[in-house]
């Protein structure tokens, strides 16, 4: 059984624009999955189906094996399981202080005050934002706002966190910190689904990758399986990770037959092995 699954999912906006065109997407409990695609591929629209914000034109979304029902009571249960973090944290953060914002979700669950305070404290600690409880969110940096948005979802204690472009607008250091946070949450058992077009981060963190283009899934598999399909990557208007592109150049232009790798560690090992063999 998959914790999140879509079957033959189609979606059209009221003006008739077709955005999703037969999406089949499966995530197992405990996985960290990346959805890769250029802007306009339909990634955000797909994610809005995972907790029932959007309703498919055709097909279905299943959470823990059960199709989503769109009555109010059923959607509350779905959103206890699947938490969604928007690309722009300013779309999600609205309370006067960090503490109040993170507390908003648990309070809406009707939890007692003591439990809400406990969850807020734990969530802020998990994202490294202890000490910011009384800060106004608009005084925070972009990376700090992302962390507060994630904390707000963590405080709901979902089984799955879905993040739309979590590194968008961040500098490289900020992006790495957010991805390390998500990686650590995943290692503690949280199922993580992210959308991104940052191909350099994906091989480092993801268990499984989907490539999306023009409302369709072009490829799925491990990072190695996906990035080895260079033709599909370029068809989706994406590029190879920079280290893999270096190997491609060495292979094709310099006739140096170094084995493919997709992270710095893999490529370093493959280059060292090649040099040892040559010596």
Swiss-Prot record:
<dbReference type="GO" id="GO:0042626">
    <property type="term" value="F:ATPase-coupled transmembrane transporter activity"/>
</dbReference>
<dbReference type="GO" id="GO:0006824">
    <property type="term" value="P:cobalt ion transport"/>
</dbReference>
<dbReference type="GO" id="GO:0005524">
    <property type="term" value="F:ATP binding"/>
</dbReference>
<feature type="binding site">
    <location>
        <begin position="37"/>
        <end position="44"/>
    </location>
    <ligand>
        <name>ATP</name>
    </ligand>
</feature>
<comment type="similarity">
    <text>Belongs to the ABC transporter superfamily. Energy-coupling factor EcfA family.</text>
</comment>
<comment type="function">
    <text>ATP-binding (A) component of a common energy-coupling factor (ECF) ABC-transporter complex. Unlike classic ABC transporters this ECF transporter provides the energy necessary to transport a number of different substrates.</text>
</comment>
<dbReference type="GO" id="GO:0043190">
    <property type="term" value="C:ATP-binding cassette (ABC) transporter complex"/>
</dbReference>
<keyword id="KW-0813">Transport</keyword>
<comment type="subunit">
    <text>Forms a stable energy-coupling factor (ECF) transporter complex composed of 2 membrane-embedded substrate-binding proteins (S component), 2 ATP-binding proteins (A component) and 2 transmembrane proteins (T component).</text>
</comment>
<dbReference type="InterPro" id="IPR050095">
    <property type="entry name" value="ECF_ABC_transporter_ATP-bd"/>
</dbReference>
<dbReference type="InterPro" id="IPR003439">
    <property type="entry name" value="ABC_transporter-like_ATP-bd"/>
</dbReference>
<dbReference type="InterPro" id="IPR003593">
    <property type="entry name" value="AAA+_ATPase"/>
</dbReference>
<feature type="domain" description="ABC transporter">
    <location>
        <begin position="4"/>
        <end position="239"/>
    </location>
</feature>
<keyword id="KW-1278">Translocase</keyword>
<dbReference type="InterPro" id="IPR015856">
    <property type="entry name" value="ABC_transpr_CbiO/EcfA_su"/>
</dbReference>
<dbReference type="InterPro" id="IPR005876">
    <property type="entry name" value="Co_trans_ATP-bd"/>
</dbReference>
<dbReference type="GO" id="GO:0016887">
    <property type="term" value="F:ATP hydrolysis activity"/>
</dbReference>
<dbReference type="Pfam" id="PF00005">
    <property type="entry name" value="ABC_tran"/>
</dbReference>
<keyword id="KW-0472">Membrane</keyword>
<protein>
    <recommendedName>
        <fullName>Energy-coupling factor transporter ATP-binding protein EcfA</fullName>
        <ecNumber>7.-.-.-</ecNumber>
    </recommendedName>
</protein>
<keyword id="KW-0067">ATP-binding</keyword>
<keyword id="KW-1003">Cell membrane</keyword>
<keyword id="KW-0547">Nucleotide-binding</keyword>
<dbReference type="InterPro" id="IPR027417">
    <property type="entry name" value="P-loop_NTPase"/>
</dbReference>
<dbReference type="InterPro" id="IPR017871">
    <property type="entry name" value="ABC_transporter-like_CS"/>
</dbReference>
